[in-house]
């Protein structure tokens, strides 16, 4: 039996963000996983920040390069999603510095940092 992939913190995964509303990110896109694999496996959920290929100066957008494409991690678009229903697929592992910075920004955003 082949083990099923369970996302872990620091993974960049492809994930379906639809349905969406208003200014939320939509469609299938990459996202940075913030939650640990133990939580993800037990809950069936992951907390992620979507990535965009647009690079606009914004306080909660962290610059990132994935597959030679410059973009940004949208920290203030933090979202909890069912990773199975969203068809999460591993793309690559981010650098630990990016994960740590994203988590720090989330803390600032929520006033817990």
Regions found by a protein language model. Give the residues of each.
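Conserved functional hotspots at enzyme active or ligand-binding sites that engage polyanionic ligands
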Residues: 1-113
